[in-house]
């Protein structure tokens, strides 16, 4: 079951506009709301229209609504927005990215798409304001994952799985307040249900409500947040698991003897909708540029365990898994990850096989809590 199944009994109309990457429809029975492109790799993205959002929001004054607007930017092929706002030569690239001319050009295009998306968010909020329902509506803004640069999307580094979460609810949530509370995606549904007046105790959710954090009644939420990556069908199997307490991140690469290959990111032709022509420049420069070699090797050849003090090493470039001074921290996080995997029925590497992937596509999961 999904969001529509749980909010509909509380009287909510539940709609979705934009990108849809979930199926079958009977498991995710959102009302389709028109106006935003559903294809995240179209070049260019189709112009968006706001009439569908306005109609959905205002249609029934007696029934509340929940609307997901899944914007497709920023996403390869990074063609929307005005990249001239970000001169490539003036950019400061993060240390986990190789510094090549093509990378700078693509990073500028990526930033332009973020700016384009930010403008869309403003337009959506104006539609809400014009409906007269803004003061009674909780708005959550978050992202799916990190950027499509090596070491980000399709990884369990912080730059791959840690995204921002912004909330607005006039009169209920204090504007400008920040919190270090640790939450994860699984917590969003029970949070919405709790705020909508539902009883979250009657269902065994993977997450738990952080409504008290939003309302300023609590400063902390969960002890740990977890992540995983199974690489099939994006490339050869390369299962990864991670846990963070908000300050430290522990990563476990379950097949460290393998090299990591991601078929889209490493696309060489540069003409496909998911290919990244900058990757070829990383490979080209790795033989004579020590930093480029370092980030290419970091991406493709990973140790069994990684431990990062993320609070002081934002891009997680210093692996401290072998540091005896922080052995207790590694043991604590590793134990927490073990307990979570057991609770999820996660066997580890066997999950990332063609057989397990095909079974999941057919709804016949080989693993998990039965």
Spans of features found by a protein language model:
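Formylglycine-dependent sulfatase
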Residues: 1-306, 314-342, 346-349, 361-370
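A glycine-rich phosphate-binding loop feature that marks nucleotide/adenosyl-phosphate handling sites
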Residues: 353-358
């Amino acid at each position: 079951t999904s969001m529509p199944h749980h909010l509909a009994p509380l009287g909510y109309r539940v709609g979705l506009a934009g990108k849809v990457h979930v199926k079958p429809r009977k498991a995710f029975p959102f009302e389709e709301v028109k106006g935003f492109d559903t294809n995240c790799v179209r070049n260019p993205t189709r112009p968006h229209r706001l009439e569908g959002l306005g109609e959905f929001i205002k249609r029934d004054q007696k029934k509340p609504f929940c609307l997901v607007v899944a914007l497709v930017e920023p996403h390869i092929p990074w063609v929307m927005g005005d990249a001239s706002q970000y001169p490539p030569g003036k950019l400061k690239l993060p240390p986990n990215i190789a510094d090549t001319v093509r990378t700078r050009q693509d990073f500028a295009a990526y930033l332009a798409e973020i700016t384009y998306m930010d403008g869309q968010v403003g337009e959506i909020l104006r539609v809400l304001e014009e409906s007269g329902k803004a003061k009674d509506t909780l708005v959550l803004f978050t992202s799916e994952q990190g950027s499509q640069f090596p070491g980000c999307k399709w990884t369990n580094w912080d730059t791959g799985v840690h995204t921002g979460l912004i909330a607005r609810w006039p009169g209920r949530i204090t504007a400008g307040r920040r919190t270090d509370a640790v939450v994860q995606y699984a917590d969003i549904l029970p949070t919405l249900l709790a705020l909508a007046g539902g009883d979250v105790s009657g269902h065994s959710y993977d997450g738990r409500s952080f409504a008290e954090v939003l309302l300023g009644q609590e400063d902390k939420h969960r002890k740990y947040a977890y992540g995983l990556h199974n690489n099939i069908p994006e490339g050869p199997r390369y299962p990864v698991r991670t846990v963070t307490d908000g300050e430290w991140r522990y990563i476990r690469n379950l097949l460290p003897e393998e090299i990591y290959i991601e078929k889209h990111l490493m696309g060489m032709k540069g003409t496909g909708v998911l290919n990244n022509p900058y990757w070829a420049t990383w490979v080209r420069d790795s033989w004579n540029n020590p930093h480029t070699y370092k980030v290419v090797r970091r991406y493709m050849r990973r140790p069994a365990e990684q431990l990062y003090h993320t609070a002081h090493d934002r891009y997680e470039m210093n692996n401290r898994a072998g540091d005896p001074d922080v052995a207790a921290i590694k043991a604590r996080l590793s134990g927490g990850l073990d307990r979570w995997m057991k609770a999820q029925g996660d066997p580890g590497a066997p999950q990332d096989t063609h057989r397990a992937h095909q079974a999941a596509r057919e709804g016949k999961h080989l693993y998990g809590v039965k």
